[in-house]
Amino acid sequence: MSRTVFCARLQKDAEGLDFQLYPGDLGKRIFDNVSKEAWGQWQSKQTMLINEKKLNMMDPEHRKLLETEMVNFLFEGKDVVIDGYTPPSE
């Protein structure tokens, strides 16, 4: 049976994550307040950030930058801005 959460990103009730995907208190906050849909959106943005900014996940500063962007995206409603990227027009 799926869980329902009030998603902080989407501002609506939606299907929650199946398990905690991120460690610590932030992971618990994500599990309790972020939907599968919003997490999927974040994963796409995260991939773009890692590739475009050439982030190395072995570097603690790069991991901290990615975590900050994640919190901004999931909880503060800020979109990820990547210099030089123009989203495709619909």
From Swiss-Prot:
Signal sequence region: none
GO BP: cellular response to oxidative stress
Molecular functions per Gene Ontology: iron ion binding
Keywords, alphabetical: Iron
GO CC terms: cytosol
InterPro entries given in the database record: Fe_traffick_prot_YggX, Fe_traffick_prot_YggX_sf
Keyword Lyase: no
Family annotation (SUPFAM superfamilies): YggX-like
Family, per entry: Belongs to the Fe(2+)-trafficking protein family.
NCBIfam families in the record: PRK05408.1
Chain's role: Could be a mediator in iron transactions between iron acquisition and iron-requiring processes, such as synthesis and/or repair of Fe-S clusters in biosynthetic enzymes.
This protein's name: Probable Fe(2+)-trafficking protein
